């Protein structure tokens, strides 16, 4: 196509159009010209060069116009070419549209023709299916017999042959299904149950792996091979995966748990120890059998020993959890279970045996018992043991109380001391329970140790209560006790034995002071026994002191001789008491006698009639003091701890011949005995019988005005326990002398 023809085909451009930039360019040019012109007019010397500027601008304008024309011409040519190409494309699109319309019509005609051929197509498909069936018909006729034969092989436990036969039938089913377009023939309906029967046979063989490994390893190998081969097979049929490998592994685990932890094997009441002992023997043997017999029958990736160990551990853990959820265990079963779980199971006799390889390690698995389980078992064990310990201790105490009423004196040991097996029984009960728990855990030992101390404190309180009842019944005459005091002294030996031996209940880990409550109860018991003994002594001495002082007392030593005889006879039983309790008894007995002596003096039964009687009373008191001092020295009481010197001090008060010096004597008496009161001094002055009112007031004022006595270490109360005017029982048990 030449240029003339092309120009005819191109559409004409519309005229009268302007560039949008033209007006702005013109404004800029005018502005630049005005700016230049204003500069020229401001500088007249430049006017001479105006012609040159005009020529230069004319040339520049011509050059710009030429360039603009060239650009515009090029632009117009490109626009014409583009318009022409659009026109050509429009013609091509219209042609393609017409061709597509014709093709659509042809397709519509072909679809109508194809519908008429659909019956023919169906006949062709049926023909192909019939052709395939005709070719497979001999094999299809043999399917029922093959299914029956396969079932026979399964029943005969010929698993590999049964699996081969099953796979042949399944392959025939696939070959038949493809040409039939997925159509399932009724002849293959028995393959599903047949495959399930074979799977169950594989599971049954795996579940009895331990027994088969010993008796028929070939069957176990066949079952495992069937499961492994089937895991690698694929099928074109849309069937759910059989997953016989996982079923085989689950059967291995379930069979193993059933053998050792089946419901029928659960321990009954009192059978836990026997059951755990059987497991101690059976589980290592099972692992050894798995390593020696089962592992060679299985692929390496089965990790038979690890599978066995983990399965046994998990089954045992679940079994123990079920056991804890059932009826509460007895203390013997609880102790056995704790010791077995914490020491035997992981010990060298079982899972920690060096004969087992690292695959049998179960230390990284969940423990058989959680911390909560262990705490619960320990609490249960301690509660049950505490109940039995309390029962045993009460039974021992009841037996001891019965012994107190015997007609014979208490038994003595080879050294002649009163003796009873009660302290040894008590400590043995407690110490054995603590010692036994040491083989389980420190926490259990701590719990039982705390329980033992608590029960020992309770036992001591019960012992004290029993003593009080025993004494009350005896004093009221409700019970005849031939040897009341000897049995009281025997209980004091019991207290000493417990005090000296209670340290065996203190393990090394116990912090100091943990035995303080028990020691406090023992101290209370000792004081109570001493008080009861002294009350018995008072009951014998009070009738004698009722006649002191008197005219008979002034003239004869018989009254005090009777006191000394009864005291000596009473204290003879002290020789059967062990030290240091015997010293405590002697101190308190001597102090009790002195207190009774002082109480008798304060009652005002005697008033001296003159100087001779005062001298006689002073000599009698000096003689009595010497007699009492000699008595208790003979019994083994040191002179330094005796209270008898108070009688010598009172003797000076009576023996004073000048009543005006009573203030000095009273002041000295107060320095020696700070607890002496005005009532005591007044009663002693009444005994003199020669003190006037003024002299009495002067003596009492010296008692009040005198310097405060200096405190002395170990000084014990004396006059503060002497009532005026009426006597009463009094006793105290702090340590220290009266002097």
UniProtKB/Swiss-Prot annotation:
Superkingdom? Eukaryota
Name the Gene Ontology biological process terms: exocyst localization; exocytosis; peptide hormone secretion
Gene3D superfamilies (UniProt xref): 1.10.357.50, Exocyst complex component Sec6, C-terminal domain
Q: Where in the cell is it found?
A: Cytoplasmic vesicle, Secretory vesicle
Task: Give the protein name, as stated in the record.
Answer: Exocyst complex component 3-like protein
A molecular function (GO) term: SNARE binding
Map out region (Mediates interaction with EXOC2, EXOC4 and EXOC5) in residue numbers: 1-370
